[in-house]
A protein has these predicted regions:
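Domain-terminus/edge residues, biased toward the C-terminal soluble/receptor-binding domains
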Residues: 25-36, 194-195, 206-211, 215-326
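Bacterial N-terminal signal peptides that target proteins for export
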Residues: 3-12
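Conserved, well-structured beta-alpha core segment at the onset of a catalytic domain
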Residues: 1-3, 19, 197, 206
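Active-site-adjacent loops and short helices of periplasmic peptidoglycan-processing enzymes
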Residues: 28-215, 224-225
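C-terminal motif of bacterial Sec signal peptides marking the signal peptidase cleavage site
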Residues: 20-24
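Sec-dependent N-terminal signal peptides
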Residues: 12-18
């Protein structure tokens, strides 16, 4: 079309604009360098029939920001405790769940998680001088510098027997140094949203700046349960293997679980099956326990108690807590 006067020019402009709109020019976007200032915005509207929503970070997690009471539970003299319905995503009970406490050997859950994430079960580990832990009362298997075993073997001994010296062996074998491995532990905690905890070692012996919360332990334990090997180990009542000593000889391992439900020293609550978990005890942390359990319908729960005053009271209180797992 040829426009020959002002009136026709206006018509031409209108028709050209309409043509651009109908042909999609209205959806054009302008490319421009990110480091330059322009007086226009660059955007594009896309029409779709799909209905989409963003998935919240905690969409598959239980959440707790305050104490939660339960008529079936009456706990006293514990540092913190919580019971989580992992299918229904409900917090059934919580007391001081976000209070920072000493974790003792529950630290080893994070150690196992990071080792499984960064290592391979068949990789060989060699003990260094750093496995010599001299703290009084520390649970040790007794490995010596130069002893070797696979990560698979080490994780079994670390989780079932709660061996602190083997935790160091795992950290150095997988991370190269304890410091690097502990860095990974803290990075993993942050990635999981466990933002109220901080680790300074892989075993859980008391150190300044080494702390967790009951809720953060739930997050870490839940993630570790995604690994088949971790699931397998925490359910075992005993473990036997052989490792190679620094002298080249084979040494037998014969250990039993520290979980008093699994070894039969304490009866499981009626209608509850304890699948497995992790124990922890130090003078600063008291007696601690985290468990995966199922009720009579097979529904899974995670329960945790921190800083109980004795082993007996720990298991009595845990049995009381699990009564709410209906």
């Amino acid at each position: 079309m040829k426009c020959t006067n002002r009136k026709k020019n206006k018509v031409c402009v209108f028709l050209l604009a309409l043509s651009c709109i109908l042909s999609g020019c209205g959806a054009a976007k302008y490319d421009m360098p990110y480091d330059s200032n322009y007086p226009v915005s660059s955007f594009q509207l896309v029409q779709t029939d799909d209905f989409q929503i963003a998935t919240p970070f905690a969409a598959d997690l239980c959440v707790v920001d305050t104490n939660v009471s339960n008529e079936d539970v009456l706990l006293t003299d514990v540092g913190s405790a919580a019971l989580f319905d992992t299918d229904g995503l409900n917090t059934l009970y919580a007391v001081n769940a976000n209070e920072q406490v000493h974790p003792a050997s529950l630290t080893k859950i994070m150690t196992a998680l990071v080792a499984l994430k960064h290592g391979s079960p068949d990789q060989m580990l060699t003990a260094t001088e750093n496995v010599k832990i001299t703290e009084s009362g520390a649970q040790l298997y007794g490995i010596k510098p130069g002893d070797t075993m696979t990560l698979d073997q080490a994780l079994h001994i670390m989780l079932i027997y709660s061996a602190n010296d083997v935790a160091v062996m795992v950290a150095e074998g997988v991370g190269g140094t304890v410091d690097t491995f502990v860095e990974w532990m803290n990075e993993e905690a942050e990635a999981l949203g466990a933002t109220n905890c901080h680790f300074t070692n892989p075993h859980g012996l008391t150190e300044e700046g080494h702390y967790v919360t009951a809720y953060d332990l739930y997050l870490i334990f839940k993630e570790a349960l995604q690994y088949e090997m971790f699931n397998e180990i925490i359910q075992m009542t005993a473990y036997n293997t052989n490792y190679t000593g620094s002298d080249g000889n084979q040494y037998a391992v014969d250990i039993k679980t520290t979980n008093q439900y699994l070894n039969g020293n304490y009866a499981m609550p009626d209608g509850i099956t304890v699948i497995g978990g992790k124990t922890g005890t130090t003078r600063a942390a008291g007696h601690c326990l985290i468990l995966l359990a199922r009720n009579s319908s097979g529904k899974p729960y995670i329960s945790v108690i921190m800083n109980s005053d004795s082993t007996e009271n720990l298991y009595l209180k845990m049995s009381d807590l699990l009564k709410a797992a209906k």
